[in-house]
Amino acid sequence: ISACLVGSEMCIRDRILASVVMLVTGYMGEAGLGNATVWGTVSALAYFYIVYEVWMGDVKKLATNAGSAVASANKALGWFILVGWAIYPLGYLIGTAEGQWYAGFANIGLDMDIVYNIGDAVNKIGFGLVIYALSRKAA
């Protein structure tokens, strides 16, 4: 996957592609379109690629070069992706556990939809508040 720099702007094609791979393969596993462990692994690899890019890859380098405000925003983004998005694999494990090596996740007493709703609330509301706070700080 290429670094994709164009002038002073970063081409986000690779990150969008990784996001699509993460979502589509996760859906395929949840929908029972093949082995859930295989689809979950492919989805997880795309997730870890995005985490890597934000914390150590081209996204981090560009943010650092853009100044402290952008680097600070990138760090907040990194934490949301690392911690906030980690809620979704838990829902995936709960929803696809039957007959898999991780079948114990089906018995932890949580409903997959509730886990996803909590993840959505944490990520959407929390991320919006962080972006708002960073914009106020920059103004």
Predicted features and spans:
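Single conserved hydrophobic/aromatic residue that forms the stacking wall/gate
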Residues: 1-7, 11-12
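Mid-membrane cores of alpha-helical transmembrane segments in multi-pass membrane proteins
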Residues: 13-22, 43-46
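Hydrophobic alpha-helical transmembrane segments and adjacent interfacial helices
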Residues: 20-30, 89
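Alpha-helical transmembrane segments in multipass membrane proteins, preferentially the mid-helix core
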Residues: 25, 46-68, 91-95
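Membrane-interface helix caps and helix-loop-helix hairpins in membrane proteins
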Residues: 27-38, 48
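A cytosolic-side transmembrane-helix exit/cap motif
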Residues: 32-37, 55-67, 131-135
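Alpha-helical transmembrane segments of polytopic membrane proteins
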Residues: 39-47, 116-120
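C-terminal transmembrane-bundle signature of multipass membrane proteins
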Residues: 53-56, 76-139
